[in-house]
Amino acid sequence: MLAALSFADASPTANKWRIEFDGQALKTGEIQFRLTPRQGEPTDVTVSIRSGRAENNVAKDVRDAFAAKLSPERYTVEVDDGEDILIKKKEGQPDFSLELVDSDVQNVSIKIEGE
């Protein structure tokens, strides 16, 4: 499994993050993310992924989990290009870091990039 990991004490911040997924889940598992606004409290997001889910469906599952957990007054969460998720701060909100904490979903690679 490929994963882009960053550490809390050195996490860069950005106004928008892209999460790219590739592959099909070979077994049911969970993906755990942490979003931390600059000088703010972290929000952990855990996403359950069922076996057999392709990258586009994994992206939708992750989008839905972030949308349910994050305030719509502070962030927008959308699917982009089918297999990518974009998380953007709204105007007036602080930049934030995004990190992959853990994943036990086999055969799904996850890449996180600030934009």
Regions found by a protein language model. Give the residues of each.
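Hydrophobic h-region of N-terminal signal peptides that target proteins for export
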Residues: 1-8
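Polar, low-complexity export/assembly segments characteristic of proteins
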Residues: 11-115
